Amino acid sequence: MNLHEYQAKQLFARYGLPAPVGYACTTPREAEEAASKIGAGPWVVKCQVHAGGRGKAGGVKVVNSKEDIRAFAENWLGKRLVTYQTDANGQPVNQILVEAATDIAKELYLGAVVDRSSRRVVFMASTEGGVEIEKVAEETPHLIHKVALDPLTGPMPYQGRELAFKLGLEGKLVQQFTKIFMGLATIFLERDLALIEINPLVITKQGDLICLDGKLGADGNALFRQPDLREMRDQSQEDPREAQAAQWELNYVALDGNIGCMVNGAGLAMGTMDIVKLHGGEPANFLDVGGGATKERVTEAFKIILSDDKVKAVLVNIFGGIVRCDLIADGIIGAVAEVGVNVPVVVRLEGNNAEVGAKKLADSGLNIIAAKGLTDAAQQVVAAVEGK
């Protein structure tokens, strides 16, 4: 779950980290009033969406008058911002952030993620602030400096100083950087985050460090113990199908193809998408119904998949372990009948009571194709899309 920039900065303030004074606004009038609260300009106005690349898309602007602030707010509030990180529809702009402009001398980068290979929280710092860190990692990886947090001791001040020295910082900037490093690490661990990023972390012309931007990603599996973060969730920024799937504990990710996929198990779901592509098809989604593939969840999964107008066929791939395939077949038959599926449905069942389940599908009289194996399922669903 991602947070908006203004929400990230509110969290920074609670932990004593330096950030520009700013206010999130939902109307042009609020935006003008925010400028008055901040004081003399110039100000920076920023569209609040869960996507990068806002500046290049016109969603960030430095302004010198309250009239310009009102014009920016009137232009963007209620509209959608399209960036290189969004789809063609963009993201809705429901708030803009008005904050004091900062005199920038130098831009740095500081962020942290959970590194699965080392099984540690890893902090990354670079002198290449203001640039996508993925681009820096690809083109100039030697400019990214890393430290890993020990899960027993947690963050240590010497690690912050180590990064500061590698960035070429001196004097009070080393102390300021170390404080920010320790604060971010504390936020990351206490708030169950999956990602934290300040890009850019700037050195002002007055010689101080300030968090000019903020990006936080919370671990969705830990939100039950982070009620205040859960309240910050903005579902308008999420794919509505993904939000609907989450309510039914379905793992759904929309893709660009035309073959809907419904599978139990994340690994099997990825393998299913691979074999569909191997046979010339394009998956329309990743959807893992999990171990409890009940009729109700299967029905809901069909509704979500078919809400995508691009879907021309559906492949259901179920491995029956604890769950019996004949019960899954009953669920599929009931779901197809209830939802009114008008596209071909190819079903591959394997495991516990698979033969009984396949017979039920064959005898149902519905437009359901029972596949004999995974390869056969992929070939049949691709052929169905091609009208063969």
Curated annotation (Swiss-Prot):
It comes from Escherichia coli O8 (strain IAI1). The keyword Nucleus does not apply. The lineage of its organism: Bacteria, Pseudomonadati, Pseudomonadota, Gammaproteobacteria, Enterobacterales. Belongs to the succinate/malate CoA ligase beta subunit family. Heterotetramer of two alpha and two beta subunits. Pathway: Carbohydrate metabolism; tricarboxylic acid cycle; succinate from succinyl-CoA (ligase route): step 1/1. ATP binds at residues 46, 53-55, 99, 102, 107. It is an enzyme of class 6 (ligase). Mg(2+) binds at residues 199, 213. Its EC number is 6.2.1.5. Keywords: ATP-binding, Ligase, Magnesium, Metal-binding, Nucleotide-binding, Tricarboxylic acid cycle. Succinyl-CoA synthetase functions in the citric acid cycle (TCA), coupling the hydrolysis of succinyl-CoA to the synthesis of either ATP or GTP and thus represents the only step of substrate-level phosphorylation in the TCA. The beta subunit provides nucleotide specificity of the enzyme and binds the substrate succinate, while the binding sites for coenzyme A and phosphate are found in the alpha subunit. Pfam families: ATP-grasp_2, Ligase_CoA. It catalyses: succinate + ATP + CoA = succinyl-CoA + ADP + phosphate; GTP + succinate + CoA = succinyl-CoA + GDP + phosphate. Substrate binds at residues 264, 321-323. GO terms for molecular function: ATP binding; magnesium ion binding; succinate-CoA ligase (ADP-forming) activity; succinate-CoA ligase (GDP-forming) activity. It comes from the Bacteria. One of its GO terms (biological process) is succinyl-CoA metabolic process. NCBIfam families: PRK00696.1, sucCoAbeta. Binds 1 Mg(2+) ion per subunit. Its cofactor is Mg(2+). Gene3D superfamilies: ATP-grasp fold, A domain, ATP-grasp fold, B domain, Succinyl-CoA synthetase domains. This is Succinate--CoA ligase [ADP-forming] subunit beta.
